[in-house]
Amino acid sequence: MKKTRNHPDELLIGLVSISDRASTGVYEDQGVPALKDWFAQALTSPWQMETRLIPDVQSTIEKTLIELVDDIGCDLVLTTGGTGPARRDVTPEATLAVGTKPMPGFGEQMRQISLRFVPTAILSRQVAVIRETPEHAALIMNLPGQPKSIRETLEGLKDESGKSIVPGIFSAVPYCIDLIGGPYIETQEAVCKAFRPKSALRVK
């Protein structure tokens, strides 16, 4: 059942943590709580979220992504976990399977940011796609599993004064959501400044 928006510009976010061990209670999931905290700091426009904690099973991941976009009506879906080279890491495969348009720039930029910190970022296979239905479209992105890496990829890199050195991927998300017919997203610039061409800016 589609979620009811409390405001025309309310962003519906789906957060999916993908982990065999966290989903069975072996350890506590850190990905979704980290994302909740980040959005609370980063967004100034209205939003609500739907969360899922599921195992590394491709069919389950695909079903969950489809449910969040097609049934719930999410505009943005973020996953954490399952993007490495191990046999059980199938999040990118599931994401590509449900997408109608690949968005390779997001994964490329995530790896560029993470390579500033660890050489093993090369092993990460994060992807992003647009999923389109006749009446709706959403952006789906894979993120790292660690809270520190999640923040780095979303916000990018800043110098000591807080000036952006390398843009984070979320800077491009609001305009992407505009282009696919979603709500107008506004951010806290000190956390992550949304970029739009002048023609796409809303007059306040």
What does each model-found stretch correspond to?
Residues 1-204:
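Non-catalytic beta/alpha edge segments that cap or flank active sites
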